[in-house]
Amino acid sequence: MAVLKKEVKKLPLPYVTDVSMRTSDPFKVLISCILSLRTKDATTKETSERLFKKAGTPEELASLGVKEIEKAIYPAGFYKVKARTIKNISKKLIKRYRSKVPDSIEELLKFKGVGRKTANLVLTRGYNLPGICVDTHVHRITNRWGLIKTKSPDETESALRNILPKRYWIIINDLL
């Protein structure tokens, strides 16, 4: 892990990590993570920042039209689907959670468009709670190294929880 940490320090921070460190805002972490799915990091940064200039809270985002959100987040991958998802999440946060992003996996998974990776990222980067964000890289690399033998990212998360010391849970995704 020491070698990985040393090498990763030479690279720019992933945008979602950067936004979490700069803002400590679980809502911005959640929205940036949704934008990051199937999108290059530079595009995630560009589109997130453009969107947050227009609207940085659930109330502000919910007040925007879907087309306005689409325009702000283009060229993020699947921008039309993401625009609807972001608007619906914002409305649900206002209606059911008093505009506060939930701090549990179970509650986060109730949002359409939020999977385990996104939920874990919100917990780890938005709330500094323990969690393991497993994307395709973490799944593929840990299996290739022979650290685990799993068939899906969900299985990988469970297996890593059993063998990885908790001090590495939050950082494993950034390291790989």
Language model regions located:
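Catalytic cores of DNA base-excision repair glycosylases
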Residues: 1-176
